[in-house]
Every structure is written in structure tokens, then in C-alpha cells.
Design a protein with these regions (language model features):
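Conserved ATP-binding TGD loop and adjacent catalytic N/P-domain core of P-type ATPases
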Residues: 25, 37, 117-119, 152, ...
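Membrane-embedded transport module
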Residues: 272, 277-350
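Conserved phosphate-coupling serine/threonine residues in phosphotransfer and NTP-handling enzymes
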Residues: 7, 196-198, 333
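Re-entrant/interfacial helical elements at transmembrane boundaries that shape
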Residues: 6-16, 54-57, 87-94, 270-271, ...
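Conserved catalytic phosphorylation-site environment of P-type ATPases
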Residues: 2-76, 231-232, 250
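Hydrophobic "anchor" residues
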Residues: 47-48, 164, 335
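P-type ATPase nucleotide-binding
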Residues: 59-190, 200, 212-222, 227
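Conserved S/T- and glycine-rich ATP-binding loop of Class I adenylate-forming
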Residues: 1, 46, 185, 333
Length: 350
């Protein structure tokens, strides 16, 4: 009986402690496997930054005003679910700009969007996306992009009928707890990696702020999956932390996927093994310690129950235990297992 109680009781207590701290484990396996994590891969938007980008710069080309550029981007991004698109829409609405309806809306995941607005063919996305669509970026636009990237800003280019008409830059705020989280993971002999769809310079800027040395930028969703698989081929257990639709495949591929629960997309939460309901990234080191403590409790309980059973059988063979005392010893073993699991309650794991 004690042997059968060892694992489920410890898992139940571990799940309870996780829920108490805003961590939801979908399976017992995810609770057990998190402690084995050797590499934590993080997306930038959400885990490292607050995930609420704001428009900071509007750089129109010659012959177009800032309001006109913003109206074009507003019409395109109105149907977008991307955080950058939502930020542009919110900014335009605050200025009470009129919304022109778009048609033939198409989204290329991780790159950009296209649509027809008032008979014009509009594109909105990163530099690579516009170039793939046959739009050339002028020297002035390239210079503006370089300057914005060095400031850690994400840049969205807008094109009309094959001609780039300007750049809209957005900036996100670094999570104050991100740097401390990376430091704690490093102290636990756990490496951190940044996987992001942002350009290399923007990614390097934020990675330097939190102390992440290994950075992979300009990634599409399938590229993130490839990077996770490559990290796993080093015979490492990889934990992926993300919040967006683009992170879902990587969350599913990783040994353990952790989604930002309240701010994350439904698809990301569904794909993940664990959800951070409070979006508190500082819980990641706690998550690993809780997993390790739970597994240690399971091993200790199994060892203790086996020793008690072996001792009881030996004493019974020697005639030192009668059926009544044997039953008491058997039940005592079950009580010990429950008490050991209860020691997990209210532990800080600091």
C-alpha cells in the first residue's frame, strides 16, 4: 500500500504547490521532467519583455506624411493577431484615425501581411518579407532601420504597389525580473538560449540586458522547432518558454513546454505542458526546484516503503511479528509516505 501511495501522493502535493504559486501542470510527467532541464530556451516577446510593445517612431518616405503612413499600416494590421500589429492598431485608434477596409488579406507567419486597400496593394512586415515580394529598400530606409535596431526596437516596413513608403518602430519593456531569473538558472547549472523572430541586433540588445549569451534571431516558427531539435541532439533536456502562436510548434517539440498563461495565445497554452497563470517568469527557477524536490520525495518514499516491507517480511518469517502487529507496521508505512510528501507543502525552494 505504501509503495503504491509513494508516487501519486507526492505528485498530488507537487501539483498543489504549483497551483498555489500560479503554475499549472497538465501531466505528472511534466512535473517530473522539468527538474531534468539543462537548457531553457526563451522567446523574446513575453518571457523577456512585457509583451506590450508601443509605437515609438514613425518614419515616412518622401511625399507621405506620418498620419498617411500610419493609416496604411492601420488598415493592414486591423485583422492581424500579432502583438506588433495590435500595438499599431491601438496607437492609431488612440489618434482617432479612420479605418479603411482591407480585402484579400493574407498573412505569412513570422514575416508579414498583405492586403488590398482602396485598390492599392499593400504590404506590411520585415525587411526580408518585402524583399521576397520584390520591394527594394532604399538607402534612407536601410539607414533608419539600422539606427532603430541598435536601440533594440522592432521595425515594420510598409509598401504600396511595390514601393516602400516608410518604417514604423515599436519598443517593448524589459521584464524587471528577467535578468535575475537568468542568473538563478545559471547558478543552477542551466544554460539559457534566446529564440526570436526579431532581427539579430534587436535580439542581441535584449539578450545583453538579461545576460543571455546564446542568441538565435530572424527565426520563423519552423526554425524555432529546428533549433529546439538541434539543442536536444546534444543529449540535453530542453525547456521552451513562449506565449505566441508562433511558439506553439517549438513548445510541442521541447522536452517541456511552458506557456505564459494569462497573456499567451490559446494555441500556445494548448501546446504547452505547463502554464504560468500569473505570467511571472521568476517562477522558472522555482519550477525546476519544485520538480527536483518532488522526484526526490518520490524516491525517498519508495525506498522507505520497500525497507519497511522488507523488514516486516523478515520479522514475520522469524516469528517476531504476528498478524496484528504486521498490519500496524503496514499502515505505519503508508502514514510515513504521506507525511514525507506533506513536507513539500509551503517550502520556498530558495
Amino acid at each position: 500500500c505504501a509503495l503504491g501511495l509513494a508516487t501519486p501522493v507526492a505528485i498530488m502535493v507537487g501539483n498543489g504547490m504549483g497551483a498555489k504559486n500560479g503554475i499549472m501542470f497538465k501531466t505528472a510527467v511534466s512535473l517530473e521532467e522539468t527538474g531534468k532541464t539543462e537548457i531553457v530556451a526563451l522567446d523574446k516577446t513575453g518571457p523577456i519583455t512585457n509583451g506590450t510593445p508601443k509605437v515609438t517612431d514613425i518614419v515616412p518616405a518622401d511625399g507621405i506624411s506620418q498620419d498617411e503612413l500610419l493609416r496604411l499600416a492601420f488598415a493592414l494590421e486591423a485583422k492581424s493577431e500579432h502583438p506588433l500589429g495590435k500595438a499599431i492598431v491601438a496607437y492609431a485608434k488612440n489618434l482617432d484615425l479612420p479605418l479603411n477596409e482591407s480585402a484579400a488579406f493574407q498573412m505569412t507567419s513570422g514575416k508579414g501581411i498583405s492586403a488590398e486597400v482602396d485598390g492599392y496593394q499593400l504590404l506590411c512586415g520585415n525587411e526580408k518579407y518585402l524583399q521576397e515580394c520584390g520591394v527594394s529598400v532604399t538607402a534612407n530606409d536601410a539607414g533608419a532601420l539600422e539606427k532603430l535596431r541598435l536601440q533594440g526596437k522592432a521595425s515594420i516596413l510598409v509598401a504600396v504597389n511595390g514601393q516602400c513608403v516608410g518604417v514604423i518602430a515599436l519598443s517593448d519593456v524589459l521584464r524587471p525580473e528577467a535578468a535575475a531569473m537568468v542568473q538563478k538558472l545559471t547558478a543552477m547549472q542551466t544554460n539559457t538560449v534566446l529564440l526570436t523572430g526579431d532581427n539579430q541586433k534587436t535580439a542581441d540588445y535584449f539578450a545583453a540586458q538579461v545576460g543571455i549569451r546564446e542568441v538565435y534571431a530572424d527565426l520563423l516558427p519552423e526554425d524555432k522547432v529546428g533549433n529546439i531539435a538541434a539543442l536536444q541532439q546534444r543529449d540535453r533536456n530542453v525547456c521552451m518558454i513562449g506565449d505566441g502562436v508562433n511558439d506553439a510548434p517549438a513548445l510541442k517539440t521541447a522536452s517541456v513546454g511552458v506557456a505564459m498563461g494569462s497573456m499567451g495565445s490559446d494555441i500556445a497554452v494548448e501546446a504547452a505542458d505547463i502554464a504560468l497563470m500569473s505570467d511571472d517568469i521568476s517562477k522558472i527557477p522555482y519550477l525546476k526546484r519544485l520538480s527536483n524536490a518532488t522526484v526526490k520525495t518520490i524516491k525517498l518514499s519508495i525506498t522507505l516503503s520497500m525497507c519497511i516491507n522488507f523488514l516486516a517480511v523478515t520479522l514475520s518469517v522469524l516469528g517476531l511479528l504476528n498478524p496484528t502487529t504486521g498490519a500496524l507496521v503496514h499502515n505505519a508505512g503508508s502514514c510515513f509516505v504521506v507525511l514525507i510528501a506533506a513536507l513539500l507543502y509551503d517550502r520556498k525552494f530558495e
